[in-house]
Amino acid sequence: MTRIYDAQKFNSAYLEFICKGSFNEIPDYYPRYRSRYAALIKKYCDLAPSTPLKVLDVGGGQLGLLCKKLWNDDAWVADIGGAHLDYVAAQGLQVKIWNLCSEEPPFKEEFDFIFFSEVIEHLPMPGHIVLERLKIALKPGGMIICSTPNLYRLRNIVYMAIGKQIFDYFRIPENHGLGHVMEYSIDHLQWQIEKSGLENCHIEYCQMPHSPNDPVFRVMYWMGSPLFLVPRFRDTLVAIAQAPSN
């Protein structure tokens, strides 16, 4: 039996532990992007059994924290460091410092699920290398949910048309993380996932309503929203894949 997504319980936990929590983004980021977190938690509910699981959130830890508060999952977070890790540790998550770009995985076949949300676009290296490291951390048959911006999203088309820089400079990070150094098309992401050795890959275009930061682009977003009926222009790719069962 899969889990039941309860919107009221999700909204309550999201407000208390995410919007009022201590994370890296500016305070109004999390109210604006609630729909993304809700969509990914719904995906998780569709795939996860009702019994508690061991879950790893690679990145900020918000999804792992929601799993802990909603279902008492054994939730872990792995990141390169930051004050947000103290906050999630105080909320009951296990914390591991891990630089995905330069370090081999500190786990082997430990996790039922891994959340890899809005991270791969920040990493200046082939995606299949980091995905292979995550595969090692999964139990046989364990699953990964990966979300990342769609290369062909409407925002990028507008940026290219007006000559605005789309990506951060591609370089080795020094003492801090990078912006988006690359984004993936659906076929490119599929190739990277399959190259890593993960199996049963399924990727879909998703549009998760939000309000852009810049007021000008906020107006353009709403004016152009009918174009999201065309899947290729949607903002986000959501991929689900599985570690080999053997």
Residues of each region from the PLM?
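Acceptor-substrate binding/catalytic loop of class I
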Residues: 29, 167-188
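Conserved class I S-adenosyl-L-methionine
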Residues: 145-168
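A short His-aromatic
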Residues: 122-123
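Conserved N-terminal segment of class I S-adenosyl-L-methionine
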Residues: 1-117, 127-132, 182-187, 204-240, ...
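A short glycine-rich, Lys/Arg-flanked "PGG" loop and its adjoining helix->strand segment in the class I
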Residues: 128-143
